[in-house]
Amino acid sequence: MATINQLVRKPRVRQKQKSNVPALQACPQKRGVCTRVYTTTPKKPNSAMRKVARIRLTNGMEVTSYIGGEGHNLQEHSVVLIRGGRVKDLPGVRYHIVRGSLDTAGVGDRRQGRSKYGAKRPKG
């Protein structure tokens, strides 16, 4: 325990909180260009082919981002918007691609949770 005198001479320093999404640089979203679109497998005990994309952001950083929803139209050179949010079973994937914005199409035939997947309201 520090004495009062020691604290007067050198106050306590607040610990800096580390960001979970450093590439966003305190912005809600960032734009980027796909450099590679591929599938990868999750950690144990899960099993799937998860769709991910490597993205070069406007600030020059390159990140791996998850493509949510069923089916997508992304390929190399597609311009996308990314947001924060990690994928628990994919190590190193800390960002999500925003569906229904820029070059990313929304999920077709989506009835519930449409706003998360950029799907329009169905007719009737």
From Swiss-Prot:
Positions bearing 3-methylthioaspartic acid: D89
Statement: the UniProt record of this protein carries the keyword 4Fe-4S: no
Cellular component terms per the entry's GO annotation: small ribosomal subunit
Swiss-Prot/TrEMBL keywords: Methylation, Ribonucleoprotein, Ribosomal protein, RNA-binding, rRNA-binding, tRNA-binding
Classification via PANTHER family: 30S RIBOSOMAL PROTEIN S12 FAMILY MEMBER
Taxonomic lineage of the native organism: Bacteria, Pseudomonadati, Pseudomonadota, Gammaproteobacteria, Chromatiales
Protein name: Small ribosomal subunit protein uS12
Function: With S4 and S5 plays an important role in translational accuracy.
Classification via Pfam families: Ribosom_S12_S23
Keyword RNA-binding listed: yes
GO biological process: translation
Assembly and oligomerization: Part of the 30S ribosomal subunit. Contacts proteins S8 and S17. May interact with IF1 in the 30S initiation complex.
Region (Disordered): 1-23, 103-124
Sequence ranges of Basic residues compositional bias: 113-124
Natural source organism: Nitrosococcus oceani (strain ATCC 19707 / BCRC 17464 / JCM 30415 / NCIMB 11848 / C-107)
Gene that encodes it: rpsL
Similarity comment: Belongs to the universal ribosomal protein uS12 family.
GO MF: rRNA binding; structural constituent of ribosome; tRNA binding
Secretion signal span: none
UniProt-listed SUPFAM superfamilies: Nucleic acid-binding proteins
